[in-house]
Amino acid sequence: AVGYRSCYDEGKRCAETLFMDYHRQNNVRVKIIRIFNTYGPRMLPNDGRVVSNFILQALNNEDITIYGDGKQTRSFQYIDDLIEGMIRMMNTEDEFTGPINLGNPNEFPVLELAERIISMTGSSSKIVFKSLPDDDPKQRQPDITLAKEKLGWQPTVELEEGLKRMIEYFKNCLLYTSDAA
């Protein structure tokens, strides 16, 4: 079925096809990695992703918006884990092109993520629920079996530790922004 997200999904599929065609025609070394929900320092505070949105809202004691009931799950991968996986993928034999999934298979309900961030920031934010868009997936969890087999890779940074680092980074961003004003 063609839904609101179809262009996003098809764009990624099309890009993989173009890379493989270019690889076959020009004998160029290609590696295809499918990246799942990555977060970490140096993210733009206003990039619109759930982790950065929740942290900024919590640090500013603003309401945290959850679409749906918050039971939908997401898997969050810390940037250091992604980089390690990418380096390992680049170092595989030329014949192995992928695709390979790099992500954290541990799922967290969106509501639990919001509650955890509020707790970790000491925020007075309240959680506000809004209607869930029709195209929003109820679950996103990567299968990293191939990454484990081919790369000897799996994520090592736990969500709690990654959030701690992100919160500290965003606190510094907010301090810098308010000092510059």
Could you tell me what each predicted segment is?
Residues 1-32, 43-47:
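Catalytic helix-loop patch of NAD(P)-dependent Rossmann-fold dehydrogenases
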Residues 176-181:
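Conserved small/polar residues in nucleotide/adenosyl-binding loops
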Residues 77-81, 158:
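A conserved structural motif in NAD(P)-dependent oxidoreductases
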Residues 86-90, 114-117, 163-170:
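Hydrophobic "lid"/C-terminal helical patch
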Residues 82, 102, 113, 147, ...:
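Non-catalytic, hydrophobic alpha-helical segments
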Residues 69-71, 97-100, 108-115, 122-139, ...:
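C-terminal "lid/loop" region of Rossmann-like NAD(P)-dependent oxidoreductases
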Residues 13, 38-53, 62, 67, ...:
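Glycine/proline-rich active-site loop of Rossmann-fold NAD(P)-dependent oxidoreductases
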